[in-house]
């Protein structure tokens, strides 16, 4: 095994760690707040569909000898999937499922999946079922079928962040969406690209890019949207204002009991005063 191969494996596990750890800040944030307000449900629906596809693609290409030989005949060795890719895909599916469970347990306000999001996800799942049936019917090779799974994952990676970016824009806030998730995801994307370039340098086979476009696209699209989320969090919506609440410190609270009674009488039932905090406090 060459030095570049060893470095590639090490980088693969590092980016696996970054991408895998990127799921936990959101889960922890939801648990700490006991609500999922500010987290897009369409993003979660797309995400679990994407990781289901990615898990199938990586596992079949890595473990199935027939599919692996079909890949060698078309692209030549090596296959663009390592054990870290399989572990990452399955781990991503499980953690996304846990986050979805949190949406049923914790307060979600009036948030729900959009009809457009449900419609897109339904069409995707129907197409996957049809392609799998065609694979068992020998209409297409299994390499073609699992490549379709990878293209679906690539498509989902392109669209899945749009609902969350729009929700942040609509709320003029990134509250409820963990920035640590974004920073770890960005690091993983950069390292994934670096690993692919090292594999090309080691083997001299540029088909590593064309043979696994989903891995390349996953890195590029993730990096692009991570940059957008970083801009939203640190530049556009640095000081979000929670709607419908006042943030008062102790010096702003009147001490005169009569004034307190007058204030209570003058306030509408919908006005809520909260000392020293904002509802939906930003995850910094």
From Swiss-Prot:
Residues 247-269 are annotated as: Disordered. GO terms for cellular component: lysosomal membrane; vacuolar membrane. It is found in: Lysosome membrane. InterPro entries: LC_transporter (IPR005282), PQ-loop_rpt (IPR006603). GO terms for biological process: L-cystine transport. The chain crosses the membrane at residues 3-23, 37-57, 86-106, 116-136, 139-159, 181-201, 216-236. Keywords: Lysosome, Membrane, Repeat, Symport, Transmembrane, Transmembrane helix, Transport. It comes from the Eukaryota. It catalyses: L-cystine(out) + H(+)(out) = L-cystine(in) + H(+)(in). GO terms for molecular function: L-cystine transmembrane transporter activity; symporter activity. It is a multi-pass membrane protein. Residues 4-70, 154-208 form the PQ-loop domain. Pfam families: PQ-loop. Cystine/H(+) symporter that mediates export of cystine, the oxidized dimer of cysteine, from lysosomes. Belongs to the cystinosin family. This is Cystinosin homolog. The lineage of its organism: Eukaryota, Amoebozoa, Evosea, Eumycetozoa, Dictyostelia.
């Amino acid at each position: 095994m060459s030095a570049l191969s060893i470095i590639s494996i090490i980088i693969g596990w590092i980016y696996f760690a970054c991408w895998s750890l990127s799921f936990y800040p959101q889960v922890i944030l939801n648990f700490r707040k006991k609500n999922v307000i500010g987290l897009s449900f369409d993003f979660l629906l797309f995400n679990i569909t994407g990781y289901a596809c990615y898990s199938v693609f990586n596992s079949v290409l890595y473990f199935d000898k027939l599919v692996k030989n079909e890949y060698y005949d078309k692209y030549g060795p090596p296959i663009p999937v390592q054990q870290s890719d399989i572990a990452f895909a399955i781990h991503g599916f499980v953690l996304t499922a846990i986050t979805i469970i949190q949406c049923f347990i914790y307060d979600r306000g009036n948030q729900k999946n959009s009809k457009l999001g449900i419609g897109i996800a339904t069409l995707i799942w129907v197409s996957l079922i049809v392609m799998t049936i065609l694979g068992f019917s020998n209409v297409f090779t299994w390499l073609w079928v699992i490549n379709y799974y990878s293209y679906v994952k690539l498509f989902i990676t392109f669209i899945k962040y749009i609902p969350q970016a729009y929700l942040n824009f609509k709320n003029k806030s990134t509250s409820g969406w963990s920035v640590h998730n974004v920073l770890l995801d960005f690091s993983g994307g950069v390292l994934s690209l670096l690993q692919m370039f090292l594999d090309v340098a080691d083997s001299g086979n540029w088909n590593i890019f064309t043979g696994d476009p989903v891995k390349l696209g996953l890195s590029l699209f993730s990096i692009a949207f991570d940059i957008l989320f970083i801009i939203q969090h640190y530049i556009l919506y640095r000081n979000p204002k929670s709607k419908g609440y006042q943030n008062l410190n102790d010096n702003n609270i009147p001490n005169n009991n009569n004034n307190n009674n007058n204030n209570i009488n003058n306030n509408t039932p919908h006005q809520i005063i909260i000392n020293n905090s904002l509802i939906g406090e930003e995850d910094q």
